[in-house]
């Protein structure tokens, strides 16, 4: 069987097993599957505000096109960070494009070489990836097992970061 025949057979099998997926519109549905927890991606007021701001600034760009450091910083993001810092009584704030990236950034940059990151066995991948990218030691503890967590904390040296 050549590759084309094999792919066709695989697709036919998926159709028979009801595992064949077809992309479609998802309008008028409640979204339980995306990272849009606050529903901002479809918020009409926000969309109108973005359109208004786009016209007001006469912008010719959709999105940053790159990292903020090199090519993608916007004054509106800096204004948001200033506002968030003020609201939370802090010197500064940093906005990330997703919770995944925020967790990755925190766990890869704040813990240092002599520190330990302990995380629940079933923690999200972004925490594990952030820990892996850091210079800190890192290990998991059994899911929801406070005794295992406590034992590992007592054996630790340096600062201990716990993620649950």
Task: Please report, for each region that a protein language model flagged, where it lies by residue.
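N-terminal "arm"/small-domain region of PLP-dependent enzymes with the aminotransferase-like
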Residues: 2-62
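Short glycine/serine/threonine-rich phosphate/pyrophosphate-binding segments
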Residues: 95, 100-106, 126-127
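Short, structured coil segments at secondary-structure junctions
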Residues: 113, 134-135
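Conserved N-terminal alpha-helix of the aminotransferase class I/II PLP-enzyme fold
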Residues: 55-98
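Conserved PLP-anchoring active-site segment centered on the Schiff-base-forming lysine
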Residues: 106-125
């Amino acid at each position: 069987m050549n590759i084309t025949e094999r792919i066709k057979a695989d697709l036919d099998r998926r159709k028979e097993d009801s595992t064949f997926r077809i992309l479609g519109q998802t309008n008028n549905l409640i979204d339980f599957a995306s990272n849009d927890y606050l529903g901002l991606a479809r918020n009409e007021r926000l969309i109108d505000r973005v359109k208004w701001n786009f016209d007001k600034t006469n912008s010719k760009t959709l999105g940053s096109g790159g990292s903020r450091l090199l090519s993608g910083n916007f004054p509106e993001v800096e204004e948001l960070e200033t506002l968030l810092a003020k609201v939370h009584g802090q010197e500064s704030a940093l906005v990330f494009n997703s919770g995944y990236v925020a967790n990755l950034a925190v766990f890869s940059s704040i813990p240092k070489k002599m520190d330990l990151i302990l995380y629940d066995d079933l923690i999200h991948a972004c925490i594990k990836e952030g820990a892996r990218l850091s210079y800190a030691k890192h290990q998991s503890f059994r899911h929801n097992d406070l005794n295992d967590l406590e034992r590992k904390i007592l054996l630790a040296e340096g600062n201990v970061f716990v993620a649950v």
